[in-house]
């Protein structure tokens, strides 16, 4: 673990994060997350907007799920859950994993628009 309070975080970065305790179907615990916040916010804010990743293949037909795969430093095939976006303090980010490429982030942005009804 290292101090992520002062590192430059970019949209598309993947980290392990401690999402702590949650309620019901919310994603919790230490898990990979994908940064979806814009880089201006990432530069100046003490918080960061993320979407959790999961390796559990459930309800894959949802338009808010994006297959990431076993790439970008991830050790298992992973899916971004864009219906589970949340803001976390950047100190919850534990370890840098990698950075998603542009085609993946384009699919993430499209799923985010669906999730937020911005289409």
Predicted segment positions?
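Conserved functional hotspots at enzyme active or ligand-binding sites that engage polyanionic ligands
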Residues: 1-119
């Amino acid at each position: 673990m290292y101090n992520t309070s002062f590192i430059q975080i970019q949209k598309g970065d993947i980290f392990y994060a401690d999402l702590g305790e949650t309620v019901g179907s919310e994603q919790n615990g230490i898990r990979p997350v994908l940064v979806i916040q814009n880089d201006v916010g990432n530069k100046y804010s003490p918080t960061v907007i993320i979407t959790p990743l999961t390796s559990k293949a459930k309800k894959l037909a949802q338009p808010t799920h994006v297959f990431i795969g076993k790439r970008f430093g991830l050790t298992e095939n992973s899916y971004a859950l864009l219906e589970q976006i949340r803001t976390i303090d950047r100190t919850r980010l534990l370890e840098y994993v990698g950075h998603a490429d542009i085609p993946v982030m384009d699919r993430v942005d499209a799923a985010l628009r669906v999730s937020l009804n911005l289409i």
